[in-house]
Amino acid sequence: MAANYWASTQRRHWLFTKERLADIRESFRERDKAAHSQFPLPDQRLLNIYFSQQLIKLGKRMSTRQQALATAQVYIKRFYTKNEIRHTNPYLVVTTAFYLACKMEECPQHIRFVVAEARNFWPEFIAPDVSKLGECEFALISEMNSQLIVHHPYRTLSELQPELSLTSDEVALAWSVINDHYLTDLPLLYPPHVIAVMAIIVAVVFKPSQTSFHGTAAPLAGAMRDGGMNILAALGDKNGAGPPPRIQKLVGWLAESEVDIRAVIECTQELVSLYEIWENYSEKHCKELLGRMVKSKNLDK
Amino acid sequence: MLKEHLDPRKPSGTGYTSKVRVRDKYHIVGFISSGTYGRVYKALGKNGQKGEFAIKKFKPDKEGEIIQYTGLSQSAIREMALCSELDHANVVQLEEIILEDKAIFMVFEYTEHDLLQIIHHHTQPHRHAIPAPMVRSILFQLLNGLLYLHTSWVLHRDLKPANILVTSSGAIRIGDLGLARLFYKPLNSLFSGDKVVVTIWYRAPELLMGSRHYTPAVDLWAVGCIFAELLSLRPIFKGEEAKMDSKKTVPFQRNQMMKIIEIMGLPTKDIWPGIVSMPEYSQLQSLAMSRAPGHFPRSSNLEGWYQSCLKNGGYATSSGAGTPGADGYDLLSRLLEYDPTKRITAQEALEHPYFKNGGPISANCFEGFEGKYPHRRVTQDDNDIRSGSLPGTKRSGLPDDSLMGRASKRLKE
Ligand SMILES: Nc1ncnc2c1ncn2[C@@H]1O[C@H](COP(=O)(O)OP(=O)(O)OP(=O)(O)O)[C@@H](O)[C@H]1O
Ligand SMILES: [Mg+2]
């Protein structure tokens, strides 16, 4: 893990407890009850799935790196800890987060190109005038206090690959687990190396043939709940009959490392519940609710 | 707890109104400098906030007469993000960043001096060398700040005297992180993107030879150049920059390479095995061929350069506190090592005998120094921080090399 994560603004200013996040969201609701009852929105994770799919669309033609999409997702999360979503045009926020993240992750895109691309997908929500995006960039940077450097679990994953002699399948799977964790609150709750360890455990323990969970979430969620939790529970019990050697090696490493096992288990649970709720995802539904909200509140103006 | 959300001035979440106003918090006392990206002003804190500040304003682009939001430059974004993250006694201290009126205001602690100004002062009215203990303290602090940057995975990429700030109490602060970037970013990042980096006189030979793979070694070459300049009061490799042609291809910096060769000798594959695979290798060969045999020294003449530099500066040629001596030469030669893979690192440099021998190093580079450096020049011709959105071409204070370097920097953004 990066030596400088410990001193980073991410650790000092952008790690929340679950309770604190819940408080923030509750205070948004308290402050604008009318909007909340008038414009119900899907579960935050379903919205996140929707946002991430929009980001992927945006990034497609611009050969954007995965890491930039991940950074954009973190920016969106941070921004919405400071702003009630119902007071914003989420399409503009998503586009701006993308534009800003591309600059930060060293794959910059011209503002005109980003706006044109966004208008391809959501002409009714993005104005042709680039200054709207420029203004939103100010809002984003200001809400984040210019703290734009994001530490991601991907790096820990590649650092641990040789140490744990992970196969390329395992790495690919862990990688996609990391991609998925951006759909939850986990990036605001845990340090990146905890997420990386969680992703590795999931990958090694399940070794499924599929390279991505998407679409096959439910069986995996089940398997993780039944099998994974047992294995995790057995982590402390080093004298038991124990899991297969491959997994034992990982268990041994975990015991040696100073990684917080409890945190890793909590992360796994978050992921399981993501895969469960994923079953209810409907792109159309998200689009309709967001569209109604933006249009009737004139948030796109 | 969440009072900030109740700001009545704030329109919808994506519209923007600054919560903090520069002029409510700072009193602008004058104008310091104007660079490619904007202007630097001197300011005093208001409302009980003590201290002096330097406010760097990134100019907004103008479209016609009205200033518009046009998206921030990548350079501004990097500088803002890095300065918010970094915290070290030898790196310039950021106070806050204010986004207001479509412009960015980075508020830094004020530093009374910089190395360009200090070096310049020692040439006026006639040359008088910078005392050896002061050079040693400057270099130590500079390397210490650089070690911090490198262990934080940050390459500075534009180290030069104008960007090395010095406080009135003699502390060195590495400034101007406008070109700095993180180097752990994987894959293509350090190959693609910006092509030209570092003001040409301080540019490492591997960059001149067309390498697009930046490593921390590029910064250490620049430190070597700065070390030499502190001793001789002149840029050691003062080449002329070949301008980018209309096709925006980066030309081979023939003249700059020649200046290096004149002192360091022709780089060969024996001392720098990687050189044969560098993009500009054939250019280097034709450069060598274009001159009469023996025109360029076969081997390094740095020691000769160093000895005459000591002599001209009135430094003792033996050893002692009055001279950088033989240890200083050894360190210089390791910083100005052709092969980037063999060049000394910041960590190693800090442990070099030049610092280990010869007693304690003061954290105040002026300690024991009798002289006085003039204050930074602050002018009144433009201290309206709000209207000054057009970049001035004029620099107050000293003539500077930086405009030249930045001209090419602009092209790559
Ligand atoms: N903290 C500071 N205190 C006092 N003066 C400063 C400070 N920071 C910068 N300056 C002055 O302003 C000049 C320009 O600052 P800086 O290098 O950060 O901006 P820049 O736009 O990148 O300029 P350039 O293109 O000239 O390199 C410095 O060389 C120095 O003279
Ligand atoms: Mg500068």
From Swiss-Prot, chain A:
What's an example of a GO molecular-function annotation for this chain?
A: cyclin-dependent protein serine/threonine kinase regulator activity
Q: Native species of this protein? A: Aspergillus oryzae (strain ATCC 42149 / RIB 40)
- The main place the protein resides is nucleus
The subunit structure is:
Component of the srb8-11 complex, a regulatory module of the Mediator complex.
Q: What does this protein do?
A: Component of the srb8-11 complex. The srb8-11 complex is a regulatory module of the Mediator complex which is itself involved in regulation of basal and activated RNA polymerase II-dependent transcription. The srb8-11 complex may be involved in the transcriptional repression of a subset of genes regulated by Mediator. It may inhibit the association of the Mediator complex with RNA polymerase II to form the holoenzyme complex. The srb8-11 complex phosphorylates the C-terminal domain (CTD) of the largest subunit of RNA polymerase II.
Q: Which biological process, per GO, is one annotated for this protein?
A: regulation of transcription by RNA polymerase II
**Cyclin N-terminal domain span:** 53-142
Q: What keywords is this UniProt entry annotated with?
A: Activator, Cyclin, Nucleus, Repressor, Transcription, Transcription regulation
Taxonomic lineage is:
Eukaryota, Fungi, Dikarya, Ascomycota, Pezizomycotina
- What name does this protein carry? RNA polymerase II holoenzyme cyclin-like subunit
Q: What gene name is listed for this protein?
A: ssn8
Curated annotation (Swiss-Prot), chain B:
Chief subcellular site? nucleus
Instruction: List the SMART domains.
Output: S_TKc
Which EC class heads this enzyme's classification? transferase
Swiss-Prot/TrEMBL GO biological process terms: negative regulation of filamentous growth; negative regulation of transcription by RNA polymerase II; nuclear-transcribed mRNA catabolic process, non-stop decay; positive regulation of transcription by RNA polymerase II; protein destabilization
Keyword set, alphabetical order? Activator, ATP-binding, Kinase, Magnesium, Metal-binding, Nucleotide-binding, Nucleus, Repressor, Serine/threonine-protein kinase, Transcription, Transcription regulation, Transferase
Residues the record lists as binding ATP: I32, S33, S34, G35, T36, Y37, G38, R39, V40, K56
Keyword Transmembrane helix assigned to the entry: answer is no
Cofactor(s), names only, from the UniProt record: Mg(2+)
**Where is the protein found, in the record's own terms?**
Nucleus
Q: Where is the active site?
A: D158
Family annotation (Pfam families):
Pkinase
List the catalysed reactions: L-seryl-[protein] + ATP = O-phospho-L-seryl-[protein] + ADP + H(+); L-threonyl-[protein] + ATP = O-phospho-L-threonyl-[protein] + ADP + H(+); [DNA-directed RNA polymerase] + ATP = phospho-[DNA-directed RNA polymerase] + ADP + H(+)
Q: Where is the signal peptide?
A: none
**What is this protein for, i.e. what is its function?**
Component of the srb8-11 complex. The srb8-11 complex is a regulatory module of the Mediator complex which is itself involved in regulation of basal and activated RNA polymerase II-dependent transcription. The srb8-11 complex may be involved in the transcriptional repression of a subset of genes regulated by Mediator. It may inhibit the association of the Mediator complex with RNA polymerase II to form the holoenzyme complex. The srb8-11 complex phosphorylates the C-terminal domain (CTD) of the largest subunit of RNA polymerase II.
The molecule here is called Serine/threonine-protein kinase SSN3
Q: Which organism is it from?
A: Aspergillus oryzae (strain ATCC 42149 / RIB 40)
